[in-house]
């Protein structure tokens, strides 16, 4: 697993440690990862059992509570117990322009959260993120207003440093929502999906944007997406509202 710590306000991550424990060993081993001059947010770990690697990845910004600028990742060799790759990829202005929703291009990725990490046999990987946010009484929240990352629950949270394990529940009412246990009406939004592919050396190969615009009041149960990995292609399934009816797309 990973252990993350940050600024005094706990709104950014600037230190990450990988914690591993070998079978039949009593003590865990802690390795600090290199994080220099950037602030991380929404950090995840994925285990590559085929290549015996750990992939740790996160969005990052250059300033505390600043705009998301790109992707940070570290590749760790399980057998050698050492770092193989540590790098960042900065999103181009063209990609930000393509990804923007209600935000401008500079803040295009501020509402995106990691949903899936897909590992390839050649050591490359793909990252799937979705623009999700919520608002209450006309006040739209940004990523720094959520205590532990995305305002929605996601199965990817199993790999996250802020895993909901421990009785927190699956809905945002039980963990991340700042309106927990009061009577405010909350509107949830789930918008574009960004898919980014990287090679084994961490170089960005291609990106794609799936357009959608979803919202619901006091529940996120019918918005968001499901993904089917068919090997040679990814299929995305989600609801779209037409004449007050949800149509599966």
Task: Set out the residue ranges of the language-model regions.
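Extended, charge-rich low-complexity regions and/or helical-solenoid scaffolds
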Residues: 204-249
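Solenoidal tandem-repeat scaffolds enriched in leucines and small polar residues
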Residues: 1-38, 43-58
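Structural signature of eukaryotic scaffold interfaces centered on beta-propeller domains
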Residues: 44-53, 107-125, 221-233, 239
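Short glycine/acidic-enriched loop and turn motifs that connect beta-strands
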Residues: 5-10, 61-65, 133-135, 241-245
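Beta-propeller blade signature
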Residues: 13-26, 68-82, 145-167, 174-203, ...
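Surface-exposed loop and turn segments in beta-propeller and other repeat-based domains
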Residues: 30-39, 81-108, 205-219
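Hydrophobic strand positions within the blades of repeat-based beta-sheet folds
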Residues: 1, 56, 127-128, 195, ...
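Short, solvent-exposed beta-strand-terminating loops
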Residues: 82-87, 129-155
């Amino acid at each position: 697993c990973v252990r993350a710590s940050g600024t005094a306000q706990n709104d950014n991550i600037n230190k990450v440690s990988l914690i591993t424990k070998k079978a039949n060993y009593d003590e865990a081993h802690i390795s600090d990862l290199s994080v220099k001059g950037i602030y991380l947010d929404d950090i995840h770990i994925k285990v590559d059992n085929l290549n015996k690697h750990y992939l740790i990845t996160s969005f990052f910004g250059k300033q505390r509570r600043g705009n998301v600028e790109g992707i940070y990742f570290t590749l760790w060799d399980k057998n050698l117990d050492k770092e193989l790759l540590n790098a960042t990829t900065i999103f181009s202005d063209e990609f930000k322009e393509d990804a923007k929703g209600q935000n401008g291009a500079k803040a295009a990725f501020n509402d995106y959260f990691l949903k899936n990490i897909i590992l390839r046999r050649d050591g490359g990987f793909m990252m799937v993120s979705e623009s999700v946010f919520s608002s209450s009484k006309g006040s739209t929240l940004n990523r720094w207003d959520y205590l532990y990352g995305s305002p929605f629950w996601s199965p990817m949270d199993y790999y996250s440093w802020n895993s909901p394990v421990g009785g927190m529940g699956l809905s945002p009412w039980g963990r991340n929502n700042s309106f927990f246990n009061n009577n405010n009406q909350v509107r949830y939004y789930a918008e574009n999906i960004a898919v980014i592919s990287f090679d084994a050396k961490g170089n960005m190969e291609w990106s794609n944007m799936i357009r959608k615009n979803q919202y619901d009041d006091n529940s996120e149960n019918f918005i968001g997406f499901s993904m089917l990995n068919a090997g040679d292609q990814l299929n995305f399934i989600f609801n779209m509202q037409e004449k007050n009816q949800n149509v599966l797309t």
